[in-house]
Amino acid sequence: MNTKFIKHHIEQNRVDTFVKYTRRYLKRMNIRLEFRQGATVRTEDGESAEGFFYEPEGKDKGVIVIAKGRPRREWLTTLAHELGHVNQWLTEDVVWSKGGLPAERDAENHSQKLIKKFNLPVDARWHKIQSKKYISFLKKTPYTDNER
């Protein structure tokens, strides 16, 4: 058998396991996970994003929405990042209530840990570079506290 074929199937199994774990984890907190086909998704504010998280409110379920029309490593890092925000919300972390750059930095750190924990097919160096670019981009944009 072709080693590339085997490697791909092993990686896909890790991805499937991670997504299955994520769905079960989120279901316990009344949050659903949605994948959309495009390269970006629209938030309730009409903003274009690679993914987003809205916490549950009252009887309304929360949601994580991920744009899956991008390379696998990109949507996986976005999903892990949004799970970082779920963790902030769940633990009532001060960075969640304040929002802004500290919340994004924390979510990026959380995503790196999740990717490592689940041994996902995302190159750690690539991810670190992308995280730095993302944080640099946010520093240049009018991203205020209480904004998530």
Regions picked out by a protein language model, each given a short descriptive name:
Residues 62-79, 98-99:
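Short pre-active-site segment immediately N-terminal to the catalytic Zn-binding motif
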Residues 1-9:
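A short, surface-exposed helix-loop junction/capping segment
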Residues 24, 34-61, 72:
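Catalytic zinc-binding patch centered on the HExxH motif and its immediate surroundings
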Residues 11-29:
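Zn2+-dependent metallopeptidase catalytic core
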